[in-house]
Amino acid sequence: MEEFIKILTDQIRCVKARQGIAQEISNHILDQAEAYEQAGLEHDKALERAVQEMGDPVEIGISMDRIHRPQINWKMLLVTFILSIAGLVCMTPMFGVSYVISRQLIFTFVGFGVIVAVCLMDYSALGRIGIAAGIVLTIVFTIGKRYYFQTINGRTPAMSILVYLYVPVFAGILYQLRKKGLSAVVLAVGIVGLTFVLAMHFSSSLMVAGNIFFCMIILLVAAIVKGMFGNNKKYMIRLIGIVVTSLTAFFGWLLWTNKDSYRVQRLIAFFNRIKYQDAEGYYYRVIQEALHNSKWIGTGNSTYFENYYFPGLTEGELLPLAVIYWFGFIAGVILLALLAGFILCAINIVRRQKNQLGALVSLACFLVLVVNCVEGILISVGLFPVTTAAIPFLTRGGSTALVYAVLIGLLLSVHRREKILTQEAI
């Protein structure tokens, strides 16, 4: 049997695929041999017959080599390229041709380089260095916030997107904690809480920290459902439910006892737009005015919108609204369709994963992408409180381009190796 498997695996060019394939073939042969033993054959003869029935190892190996090799998701790469170009075009009316060419175009090219580099890397390293990667990220963020990144009005804009890198790192941490039972779940919950505090500290944004908390809780539940921490799934999920409910109630109480804070006032203004339209609710008046005066094709006719100071617009966080106003509703629909196609490509990658780490890493990247897409679009049409948002391809800046390039690269890396890495090979 060993010689048969060696000849077979020698035909497979991808070295990383050999171990998993050898294990699969070995299990299949042993199962068949066991069936022959139960039928009355001796062990050696049963094993010999099972090997003979497998056929020519060279032909089988060549056939498996066609399947178990790295693959590129060209569809997702194409959608990424189209959205990158569309994003540059959409930014031009807001920031000008000189800015787009001198800065954002460079960020886009660098981003594509990062996508390719991460795609070619072995994402399974996250399953071995997740905890160490989290510590390194925290050190880098601490140094960056203190000495490098620009702080504006108490906030560090770059950190509002960079902290999302904690999410795929958490996927690697969960994989490291697998098979360790309830204690690992409790530790994972503690890591989620610590990450929330760190994200809040670095980004100075409750919404960003909340988004990260949400993504990490979903990842933890997914890991439990997959049986990574044992079979007592219902108890573990109830434990997480209690923690999430308690924290939600606690933060709700904090907001209620701090009604005069700007966060609470902006939230109240979202539900009482007419009453607060000259104060915190002026954002929603601008959004309503822009949408009301937009056309199906071409630029809208609201000088009020163009001249009004709107931080979300000047920073590019609400670019979908600007696209609708400057290019028309049809352009907005096309842009939305492209984003939907991109998200569907990501969903397809997540859905196809069979090994635990690939499933968690792809899910982590997908969650960050979809949360920011949905949140940014809803904000742009006035269906969500105005807050910090970084929509993929539609928010300017080097940090945004870098983070989304890493996430897209990880998705492509998972897809590239989905027919190579088995659970045992990781």
Predicted ranges, named:
Residues 1-77, 81:
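Soluble N-terminal domains of membrane-associated systems
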Residues 48-148, 192-195, 329, 366-370, ...:
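A structural signal for hydrophobic alpha-helical transmembrane segments in multi-pass membrane proteins
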Residues 101-126, 162-181, 218-231, 344:
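Transmembrane alpha-helical segments and their membrane-water interfaces
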Residues 106-114, 325-346:
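Hydrophobic alpha-helical transmembrane segments
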Residues 174-191, 376-426:
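A juxtamembrane structural motif centered on a specific transmembrane helix
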Residues 190-196, 207-255:
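Hydrophobic alpha-helical segments of polytopic membrane proteins
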Residues 234-332:
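Hydrophobic, glycine- and aromatic-enriched re-entrant/interface helices and adjoining loop segments
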Residues 349-387:
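Loop-to-helix entry and N-terminal half of a specific, functionally important transmembrane alpha helix
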